[in-house]
C-alpha cells in the first residue's frame, strides 16, 4: 500500500495573525522536509492512482483565500509541487470578505483583504500552472445540517460552476470537515470522485471521506515532523482524529 499524506492549509500569508494563516516560509520548510523524505507532490485527484509513486503528497488549501495565489503558488512552484485549492464558489470574485464562525468583526476589519476569495481569473491561472481546483460547496455551510434539497444544491451548483469556468471538477472538501454517510452519498451522486475530510473522523480512508492533516501556525517544524510521522497518523485514525494533536475547525 502506498503511503499517502494529504495536508490541509488555509491562508498562506505573513500578514494575518490568525490560526488559519500559515507563513509562506513555514509552508516551504514543511514541504521541503517531506520531499527530502521521498514524497512526491501530486494533485489530490491523483493520490489513488494505481500507477503512482510509493510515497504521495497532496498539498491542499481550503476556502480559496487570495493569499494562496500570492504566496502558496510561488512557493510550490519553486518546489515542483502542484497544489489543490477547494473554493466556495458563491464567494469567488466577490469584493466582500468571507466570514466563518470564529472570525469576528475585529478580524474582518483590519484583515478584510486577507479574507477575500480569489477571482475566477486567478483560479484559471492556478489551473494553467497545473493546480487542481476542487469544490468547497457554494456557501460553506455545515452540510450535515442541510436538508436533502439544500445539500444537493450546495454540492451540485458548486461543481457545475467550476466545470463551466475551468472544464472539470472531480473533488470536494467538506466545510469544517462536517460529513456523515448521507452527505457522502450525496457527494457521490453529485458527481465527485474523491472528497476530503477534516478532522479525521473515519477509521480508514474512503473515496468520499479521505483524511487530511490540518496544518496551522502552531505547527512549528518539530511539531510538524511529529504530526506527519506514520505512528502519529496511525494513532489519530485509531482514536478518531480529535484525541491526538487536536486541530481547529476548518
Locate the predicted segments by residue.
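Acidic (Asp/Glu)-rich catalytic clusters
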Residues: 1, 35-36, 74-80, 118-135, ...
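C-terminal active-site subregion of NodB/CE4 polysaccharide deacetylases
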Residues: 1-60, 66-71, 145-250
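Histidine-centered divalent metal-coordination motifs
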Residues: 10, 136, 140
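Generic enzyme active-site microenvironment
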Residues: 60-61, 134
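Solvent-exposed loop/turn segments at secondary-structure junctions
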Residues: 65-66, 90-93, 139-141, 178-179
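A short alpha/beta connector and helix-capping loop motif
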Residues: 71-89
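Generic beta-sheet signal
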Residues: 86-88, 136, 197-198
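Aromatic- and acidic-residue-enriched segments that line the glycan-binding/catalytic groove
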Residues: 93-113
